[in-house]
């Protein structure tokens, strides 16, 4: 997207109204993918200039930093202390026991791919393991942080291995219109999955990625890529009424030895005429979620992490625990949430079944119903009706 075309995409109001998608001038070329390739630009946002929003920040070395007092950088000594002195309580059992405790279901779309894509005000969510969810809303099908590989690692011969297989392959997915990437850690941005999705869908698939990730996406062959800073927005061509806003989170980025925080991290707020979806990505707890809820809430559905949180002295800055996940649910004003980032990879020291148990305790503490924060089986779908009653 060139500068002249970008300048045509102007906002027409200072405040995002909760009752409808913001109207904006849109003289974008209807030709589609050619005009959107390798884009570093978005609509011009008035609210990005507001004084009370937390803007992305870089340090003196030009790398992104977390702007909240709730953040502390992970250090090599603290990492070594965790690895050497902390006991691993994950206790992942054999496959037979896992099949009983964490069954992997066949997603509905494998046998009936034509059924994918809800109409009107309906919303359906399918958990595909870890932070990968498929969301059908407002005539679009979205995928978050796709990883279908056996390992979350630069090599499929070593590194964290799934103890629950992916419920489907990329080839078995239905039509996907957009992929949301929260950050570049290997368990959220898997090169093999990106390449497979790009080979399957090509330029028909729009990628929404954080600032600094565009070059990496290009090297994977992806062309229909939109790279955004916090509080910037864009859309899928032909679906201008659904707005994708890159919003803050408290985390960090790294893929190689020397590239710490050269790429931004964040969450996603997807705002449609019928539904609103929030994807928290990977995050510690911070004040950003109240800002997001204030501007874009209430959300019909939020996908919020509940796992990889022990030991707290090391993990709390980068990974919320189940109680903090409930706080995010409240902060963003989610009507329903779905638990992600658990039950797939053993990335921390809590027992592999502890996250949903602790989530139930937290929901009771905050006087919320268990059905307010869904815990799905791998491959399971849930349909959310317009009257806010969920149906399997």
UniProtKB/Swiss-Prot annotation:
GO terms for cellular component: cytoplasm; early endosome; early endosome membrane; Golgi apparatus; Golgi membrane; neuron projection; neuronal cell body; nuclear envelope. One of its GO terms (molecular function) is zinc ion binding. An N-acyl-1,2-diacyl-sn-glycero-3-phosphoethanolamine binds at residues 186, 319. Residues 1-16 have a biased composition (Polar residues). Activated by divalent cations. Activated by bile acids. This is N-acyl-phosphatidylethanolamine-hydrolyzing phospholipase D. Binds 2 zinc divalent cations per subunit. It is an enzyme of class 3 (hydrolase). Gene3D superfamilies: Ribonuclease Z/Hydroxyacylglutathione hydrolase-like. One of its GO terms (biological process) is N-acylphosphatidylethanolamine metabolic process. Its cofactor is Zn(2+). Homodimer. Bile acids promote the assembly of inactive monomers into an active dimer and enable catalysis. Zn(2+) 2 binds at residues 187-188, 282, 341. Its EC number is 3.1.4.54.
